[in-house]
């Protein structure tokens, strides 16, 4: 693929930082190497000398001596080599990307670690979006994505979707305004990429089926656009077998996938990872070299030590326990909704994730209801307008999260909300 046509002028101008290059060399060098290159602080002057973390099974992860010194020091912008290696092997096991053994300049799969997947996504957007570019999304979508894209001056087009995700026929209709060969002409402004959250979409909880993904991928090939597969809730799918990913069917090297440990291990550690064609991942890393420099070394090593202790089987066992918890939480909020909101509102059963997307009947704009009146009744929800491209347009929707509240709290919240809706009709 010709990746240069997707890159912005800023991204094309990026060059490796010589300082960061020496850090990469140092991370792989033998201990006999005498380093006078980097400006790394002397760890003997760091005030922290040890740390210990107790894991849920009662075991302990300890940071002492050389490990604590490493955890508090600069590290490579790509990510810690051992964690990169573990994650690459895990991605191959989970998704078996066709591009694993491609030549580096022809879409070979690569991976880098970011400060949460939002960090990686923002860098991907800035790598790809020029003012006036056409970008495809499916509403409603996470405001963090919208607010990262909008300042870049792109033309954001909504692709119709339902409870099973993006509707391929709707995408075909949008694409029909161009000819496939138009992608070779920058003045035609053909779509540069499709952004989607395929599992447990925030806020709807909808998931894209495998069959639809195949149709969408073929359209991406026909019209030559990239796919950004933002999948933070991949490990929170409530039914097995899990649907195949876009990465698993990427024969061209046109998929950039964003993963995170935020939903399953810790949101505060801020560790995510981006997988995709080497040319594009390298550009994200070049951005990291001169911005955040690298993801937190301590956070990366905490996760690495945990993964080494667990192994793949232990990690997936933790995922199963996590899924059971959130599935029970989902069932609790559905029970509360059915008890109090039946007849007043409607919703689909979330397939994954942490959210229930609710449409109130008879109220065309829930903004005041949710932002003011519900808070007065001590119920905090998110109004739906912020999840749409035109955030000023009225909407009957709002988002309820089932991640933190107890079943009793969910029941009480929806009881209060039901009374409020009745008063507002």
Swiss-Prot record:
Transmembrane segments: none
List of residues binding substrate: 20, 74, 202, 399
GO CC annotation, single: mitochondrion
Pfam families, per database record: Aminotran_1_2
Annotated positions of the N6-(pyridoxal phosphate)lysine modification: 263
This protein's UniProt keywords: Acetylation, Aminotransferase, Mitochondrion, Phosphoprotein, Pyridoxal phosphate, Transferase, Transit peptide
Record bears the keyword Lipoprotein: no
Residues bearing the modification Phosphoserine: 40
Pathway: Amino-acid degradation; L-lysine degradation via saccharopine pathway; glutaryl-CoA from L-lysine: step 4/6
N6-succinyllysine modification, residue list: 172, 263, 339, 367
Catalysed reaction, written as an equation: L-kynurenine + 2-oxoglutarate = kynurenate + L-glutamate + H2O; L-2-aminoadipate + 2-oxoglutarate = 2-oxoadipate + L-glutamate; glycine + 2-oxoglutarate = glyoxylate + L-glutamate; L-kynurenine + glyoxylate = kynurenate + glycine + H2O
Transit peptide per record: 1-29
Cellular localization per UniProt: Mitochondrion
GO biological-process terms attached to the record: 2-oxoglutarate metabolic process; biosynthetic process; glutamate metabolic process; kynurenine metabolic process; L-lysine catabolic process to acetyl-CoA via saccharopine
Known tissue expression: Expressed mainly in kidney and to a lesser amount in liver and brain.
Residues modified to N6-acetyllysine: 69, 179, 263, 339, 351, 367, 422
Annotated GO MF terms: 2-aminoadipate transaminase activity; glycine:2-oxoglutarate aminotransferase activity; kynurenine-glyoxylate transaminase activity; kynurenine-oxoglutarate transaminase activity; methionine-glyoxylate transaminase activity; protein homodimerization activity; pyridoxal phosphate binding
Named cofactor requirement(s): pyridoxal 5'-phosphate
Entry's EC annotation: 2.6.1.39, 2.6.1.4, 2.6.1.63, 2.6.1.7
Known function: Transaminase with broad substrate specificity. Has transaminase activity towards aminoadipate, kynurenine, methionine and glutamate. Shows activity also towards tryptophan, aspartate and hydroxykynurenine. Accepts a variety of oxo-acids as amino-group acceptors, with a preference for 2-oxoglutarate, 2-oxocaproic acid, phenylpyruvate and alpha-oxo-gamma-methiol butyric acid. Can also use glyoxylate as amino-group acceptor (in vitro).
Quaternary structure and interacting proteins, as annotated: Homodimer.
Similarity remark: Belongs to the class-I pyridoxal-phosphate-dependent aminotransferase family.
This protein's name: Kynurenine/alpha-aminoadipate aminotransferase, mitochondrial
């Amino acid at each position: 693929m010709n990746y240069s046509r997707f890159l912005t002028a800023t991204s094309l101008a990026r060059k490796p930082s010589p300082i960061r290059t020496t850090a990469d060399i140092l991370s792989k060098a033998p201990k006999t190497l005498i380093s006078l290159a980097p400006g790394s602080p002397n760890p003997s002057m760091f005030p922290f000398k040890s740390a210990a973390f107790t894991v849920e099974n009662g075991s302990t992860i300890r940071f002492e001596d050389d490990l604590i010194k490493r955890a508090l020091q600069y590290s490579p912008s790509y990510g810690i080599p051992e964690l990169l290696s573990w994650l690459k092997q895990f991605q191959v096991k989970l998704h078996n990307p066709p591009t694993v053994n491609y030549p580096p300049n022809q879409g070979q799969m690569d991976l880098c670690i970011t400060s949460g997947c939002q960090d990686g996504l923002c860098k991907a957007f800035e790598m790809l979006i020029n003012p006036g570019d056409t970008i495809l999304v499916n509403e409603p979508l996470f405001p963090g994505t919208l607010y990262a894209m909008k300042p870049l001056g792109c033309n954001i087009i909504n692709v119709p979707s339902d409870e099973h995700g993006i509707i391929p026929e709707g995408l075909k209709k949008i694409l029909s305004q161009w000819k496939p060969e138009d992608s070779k002409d920058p003045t035609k402004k053909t779509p540069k990429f499709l952004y989607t959250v395929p599992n447990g979409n925030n806020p709807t909880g909808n998931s894209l089926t495998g069959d639809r993904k195949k149709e969408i991928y073929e359209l991406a090939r026909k019209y030559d656009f990239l796919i950004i597969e933002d999948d933070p809730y991949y490990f929170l799918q409530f039914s097995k077998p899990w649907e195949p990913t876009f990465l698993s069917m990427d024969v061209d090297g046109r998929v950039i996938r964003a993963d995170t440990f935020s939903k399953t291990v810790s949101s505060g550690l801020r560790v995510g990872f981006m997988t995709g064609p080497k040319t594009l991942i390298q550009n994200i890393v070049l951005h990291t070299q001169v911005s955040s420099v690298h993801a937190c070394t301590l956070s990366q090593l905490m996760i690495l030590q945990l993964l080494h202790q667990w192994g793949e089987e232990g990690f997936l066992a933790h995922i199963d326990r996590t899924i059971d918890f959130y599935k029970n939480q989902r069932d609790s909020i559905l029970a509360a909704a059915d008890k109090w909101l039946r007849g007043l509102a409607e919703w689909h059963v979330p397939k994954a994730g942490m959210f229930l997307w609710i449409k109130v009947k008879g109220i065309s704009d829930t903004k005041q209801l949710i932002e003011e009146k519900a808070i007065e009744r001590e119920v905090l929800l998110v109004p739906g307008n912020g999840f749409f491209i035109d955030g000023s347009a009225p909407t009957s929707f709002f988002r309820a999260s089932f991640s933190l509240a107890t079943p009793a709290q969910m029941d009480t919240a929806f009881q209060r909300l039901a009374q409020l809706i009745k008063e507002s009709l």
